[in-house]
């Protein structure tokens, strides 16, 4: 603060003398606090963990410090298992476990140092939540954890804790750059099939493979294979650069790999920065630095700091790109992995779910035309979770309440957005009487495009063949006309995908009917000679 030393500014802020105009909305904060505290919003119930510290004076006078971390290490080693956890069903069980640990580490002649024991019991799983007005970057509410606070200015999981963002990062590091600068559209397809790069094999959460799949569907259903292949196409460096530009300060060069598209990061990200990134998409592609105050005034009313004049703003993706991503994420809410978070009421909602390996982290990131909200949930010690739906529960109940008195509206469509009919299996223009004759039903559908990106080529993943019903093979020149039918096949599908059973393989294409190998006239003439 201008004119203040660091110590003077600290005292003025926390002990009086300065007026801080906060961006917090007390009503929204109250709603967040109430819903985070409501145990009914947590699927698997509540457990309890703790922060522990105590000192032991050993027989020879040496002082040793023990913590919850040393406790974890001690029992994992003692039990020869990595599954030991300090998450218990009650506070009483926590205290009993601590007492047993103290007993186990105290040797003969050792003593617990008086007044050295510190125990703080906390609920698990923990959560972090941030609600931001995307048009300004102003934080309206923030929750740094659940349970009673140990004191003022304690650890805030929303601003200080870095955790893996999981599939919420697919939008940030893959699909935003793919649509914005990678030459992709929502209709662009990848073959969702078994996929290995080097010694790394990628899989989908469902362990199934859908074949040729559009980016829109991959966002809606959170399909990993399509995401990784898309980033491979556009280049890891492009994905990394876009993620950085979205405001993430914890990325490192070790994150320059395909894993960034799935949210597999070296350090992870904070809930606050993830909220700001999604807020940029909600704000027509313009990033606003998160702010907790607008102005700081001295006791005479003089403006010492004016955040509205100094906050960082930049366009991170085109307005058209932001709208296209938003439209795909609307599908997430109504027919995809985010249906549980959808609160209805006619208010437009867009979002993306996320989980990490063994469900250690669960997230939901989403927005309306008014607010952006991101919820993270997980155990402080990174334990495996048995349920991951509660971030969606929290997002739904909080966002429904804070929008109760707001006018329902949709996201405004930019003038540069157009529509075109394409084939779902190629992302290209459909071939007449081919793509709509797919054995599973028509594959033609209407998609949105940024101006200038509508495909001009025809589908290259469907083919129409004349098939002999007698042999089931490609009809030859001697097959009777009344036994020949026209069928549509997929071409280029990989083995193991849902498309493969409808695929005309190279072997199939190169083989023709072996029943009608010669003409009927030639056969009758041969019989007459005999």
Say what each PLM segment does.
Residues 1-4, 26-27:
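Long, well-ordered, tryptophan-enriched scaffold segments
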């Amino acid at each position: 603060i201008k004119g203040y030393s660091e110590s003077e500014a600290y005292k003025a802020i926390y002990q009086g003398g300065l007026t801080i105009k906060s961006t917090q909305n007390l009503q929204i904060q109250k709603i967040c606090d109430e819903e985070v505290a409501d145990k009914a919003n947590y699927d698997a119930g509540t457990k309890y963990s703790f922060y522990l510290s105590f000192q032991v004076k050993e027989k020879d006078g040496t002082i040793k410090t023990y913590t919850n971390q040393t406790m974890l290490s001690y029992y994992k080693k003692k039990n020869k298992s990595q599954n030991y956890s300090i998450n218990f069903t009650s506070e009483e069980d926590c205290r009993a476990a601590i007492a047993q640990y103290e007993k186990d580490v105290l040797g003969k002649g050792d003593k617990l140092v008086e007044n050295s024991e510190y125990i703080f019991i906390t609920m698990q799983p923990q959560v972090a939540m941030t609600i931001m007005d995307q048009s300004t970057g102003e934080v309206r509410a923030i929750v740094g954890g659940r349970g009673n606070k140990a004191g003022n200015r304690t650890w805030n999981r929303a601003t200080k804790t870095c955790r893996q963002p999981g599939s919420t990062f697919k939008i940030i590091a893959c699909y935003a750059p793919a649509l914005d600068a990678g030459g992709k559209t929502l209709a662009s397809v990848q073959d969702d099939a078994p996929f290995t790069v080097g010694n790394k094999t990628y899989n989908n959460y469902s362990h199934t493979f859908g074949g040729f799949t559009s980016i829109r569907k991959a966002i809606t259903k959170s399909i990993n294979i399509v995401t990784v292949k898309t980033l491979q196409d556009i280049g890891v460096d492009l994905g990394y650069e876009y993620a950085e530009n979205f405001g993430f300060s914890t990325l490192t060069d070790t994150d320059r790999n395909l894993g960034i598209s799935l949210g597999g990061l070296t350090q992870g990200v904070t809930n606050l920065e993830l909220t700001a990134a999604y807020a940029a998409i909600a704000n027509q592609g313009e990033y606003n630095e998160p702010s907790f105050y607008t102005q700081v005034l001295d006791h005479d009313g003089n403006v010492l700091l004016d955040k509205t004049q100094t906050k960082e703003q930049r366009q991170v993706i085109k307005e058209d790109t932001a709208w296209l991503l938003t439209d795909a994420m609307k599908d997430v809410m109504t027919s995809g992995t985010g249906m549980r978070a959808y609160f209805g009421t006619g208010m437009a909602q867009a979002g993306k779910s996320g989980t990490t390996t063994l469900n250690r982290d669960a997230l939901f990131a989403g927005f309306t035309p008014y607010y952006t909200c991101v919820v993270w949930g997980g155990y402080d010690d990174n334990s495996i979770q048995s349920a991951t739906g509660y971030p969606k529960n929290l997002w739904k109940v909080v966002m429904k309440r804070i929008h109760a008195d707001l006018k329902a509206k949709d996201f405004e469509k930019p003038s540069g957005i157009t529509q075109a009919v394409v084939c779902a299996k190629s992302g290209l223009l459909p071939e007449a009487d081919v793509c709509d004759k797919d054995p599973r039903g028509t594959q033609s559908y209407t998609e949105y495009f940024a101006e200038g990106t509508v495909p001009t080529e025809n589908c290259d993943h469907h083919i129409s063949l004349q098939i002999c019903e007698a042999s089931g093979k490609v009809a030859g020149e001697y097959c009777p006309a009344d036994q020949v039918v026209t069928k549509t096949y997929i071409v280029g599908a990989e083995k193991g995908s849902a498309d493969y059973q409808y695929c005309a393989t190279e072997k199939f294409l190169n083989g023709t009917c072996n029943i009608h190998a010669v003409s009927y006239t030639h056969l009758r003439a041969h019989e007459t000679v005999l």
